[in-house]
């Protein structure tokens, strides 16, 4: 009987670990430019953010640029789905980094613009303009800033 109980516990633990691994892998299935059409919660959070912002380009308003896979970020128990997007014709000069609360209630962004024609020997990070969207708290700002700095072309 004890053997059967141990076997059942092992099976349950294995199933739980497997489902956690699948959930962790699924975050990479999403891309920022697909979220609005696939999930009403993300769409509403993004619409709430952009309605309070002025003078944003269409590709930012509609999340219609070129996107990288999104990933989960856990910051001391607060979880976010984070991803990046850039303007299709100007990925080096026009970027957007976005974090959604895990419950999809809020979206936050970092809109980054690098001046056109910046010489290759100039650091984009020293010449860029940064605009926070959605009034992110310092912890979310740090997450988005780290996402930007993780790009090997950002120096």
Curated annotation (Swiss-Prot):
Gene3D superfamilies: Inhibitor of vertebrate lysozyme (3.40.1420.10)
Residues annotated as transmembrane: none
Subcellular location: Periplasm
Source superkingdom: Bacteria
Disulfide partners: 86-91
Predominant localisation class: periplasm
Name assigned to this protein: Uncharacterized protein PA5481
Organism: Pseudomonas aeruginosa (strain ATCC 15692 / DSM 22644 / CIP 104116 / JCM 14847 / LMG 12228 / 1C / PRS 101 / PAO1)
């Amino acid at each position: 009987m004890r053997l059967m109980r141990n076997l059942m516990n092992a099976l349950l633990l294995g199933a739980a670990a497997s489902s956690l691994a699948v959930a962790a892998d699924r975050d990479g299935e999403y891309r920022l430019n697909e979220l609005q059409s696939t999930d009403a919660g993300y769409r509403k959070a993004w619409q709430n953010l952009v309605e309070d912002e002025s003078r944003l380009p269409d590709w930012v308003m509609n999340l219609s640029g070129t996107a990288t896979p999104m990933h989960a970020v856990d910051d001391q128990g607060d979880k976010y789905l984070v991803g990046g997007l850039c303007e299709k014709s100007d990925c080096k000069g026009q970027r957007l980094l976005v974090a959604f609360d895990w419950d999809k209630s809020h979206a936050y962004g970092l809109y980054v613009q690098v001046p056109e024609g910046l010489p290759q020997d100039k650091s984009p990070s020293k010449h860029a303009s940064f605009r926070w969207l959605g009034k992110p708290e310092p912890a979310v700002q740090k997450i988005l800033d780290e996402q930007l700095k993780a790009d090997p072309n950002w120096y």
